[in-house]
Amino acid sequence: MLRRFHLFALALMLFGAAGLSRHTFAQTTQPAQTAQPAVPTPTPELKVDKKVQPVTGKDAKTPTAEQVVETVIIVYGGGGGRDTLKQIRRNGVERGKVTRTANDGRVEELSYEQRFVRGETAGKDKIRVDQKMPTMEYALVFNEGRIWGIINGTAFTPKQDVTAEFLSQSQHGIDALLRYKENGSTVAFVGKEKLKGLDLWVIDLTDKDKSRTRYYISANPDIRKTARVLWLEYEETPPEASAPSKYRRTFHDYRYSQNTLVPFRSVLYRDDKQVQEARVQTVTYGIKMDESFFQNPEAAAN
């Protein structure tokens, strides 16, 4: 009930009373929720950055970049915005399956378990992704800027392409937009477009390494659909290539997990060819995390 009230209040700020008159905010059937072992955290009162107001009815056509992004942050925080995301998503565990298509057309499926602890910035995060394939199991660990792999309890240096893919997921992801201020990134409003019948805000994010990601965000006046990242695009030169490739990641099956918005399915395209599909099965935030998960076995032994 609290979340519905907060989102209704947000709708008033987003599009004004006139915009709401065209929509009926009746109770809607939500997608079936994946069973969550943790008790959902209550959504705090709606808080808005006083320096940057979210998009309102009067400026919905020509908002600033910060207005759009701050609106996205409010929506993904279930109405509580940045404070809710920091409180609930400070750590967690995500489990799911990934289907990959190799350059030679081979398709492989793996299951994964990702544990994370958020730092003040993305560079200070701790992330561990355990991956299980039919023929092997291994983990990749990011700990405050350092990356290594673990297989059978022994540390190893991942291949360059594996490291690049691992880093790209956080550098060019939704979290990079939600944490743009903490990471010292800049955002620019490209424009409002209509693509594939969708009203979109287009935002460019440039991080401190000058890497750019373009986000296509729903500008639908319906509060149940607005301010969601529908897809993003970026260019990157793979380690084995001499020219950059164009990547596009699309996001689907949005659900609320502990009062924060999560896409449970994403698809990655490289030069318009699908190379990866990820499906989240469960995600739980606010779990006490053992530091040993993020330690290098060799360093721990010494």
List the predicted regions and their residue ranges.
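Bacterial N-terminal signal peptides that target proteins for export
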Residues: 1-10, 21
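C-terminal segment of classical bacterial N-terminal signal peptides
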Residues: 15-25
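N-terminal propeptides/low-complexity segments immediately following signal peptides
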Residues: 27-48
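Flexible, processing/modification-adjacent segments and terminal tails
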Residues: 41-43, 54-56, 60-68, 73-77, ...
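N-terminal mature ectodomain segment of secretory-pathway/periplasmic proteins
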Residues: 48-155, 184-194
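Short, surface-exposed beta-strand/loop "edge" segments at domain boundaries and coil↔beta transitions
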Residues: 102-108, 135-140, 155-158, 210-214, ...
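Short amphipathic beta-strand/extended segments with alternating polar/hydrophobic composition
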Residues: 109-113, 140-144, 156-164, 216-217, ...
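Gly/Pro-enriched, hydrophobic low-complexity segments
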Residues: 196-298
